[in-house]
């Protein structure tokens, strides 16, 4: 399998942060988004950013900007689809997604996802961590996605499907278990941002 392309999902509305782009919030010497870029670019062949609205606000990052192709705010699957369409144009087989508001995700995210996908015709794997109540908790914005299923995903979104795990389960998606739940800590509130600073 060719090395996946990377797609950072930054299409959320950030309502609990007062709106705007969470990825552009300061963290350490950079931003949430720059932290995510630094971690992901070491693991993928090339990278793009899924975001809607004025693309010039991300110009400093020098990445292709992929807007959602499905009208309305329909959630992360629309960003996945935008990434799959971009990857298809590059001749790639798969993408790995990461969320722009989750700066501490594992540095071995991609190798673990690829390992979990061995033997799959259409590699489809979500990151997961141990959960005391549910056994495991899946992290649907962190996954390995096959370009071959992009038209099926488009049809599902046009039909109203929004929940990531419903679609992945329909296609026999697997989970890749990561031991550290804190690695998937995401910033949703000002308090979360303060905690992220303390975690540096």
Q: Which residue stretches match the model-derived regions?
A:
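Nucleotide and nucleotide-moiety/phosphate-recognizing core
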Residues: 1-161, 166-185, 190-192, 198-200
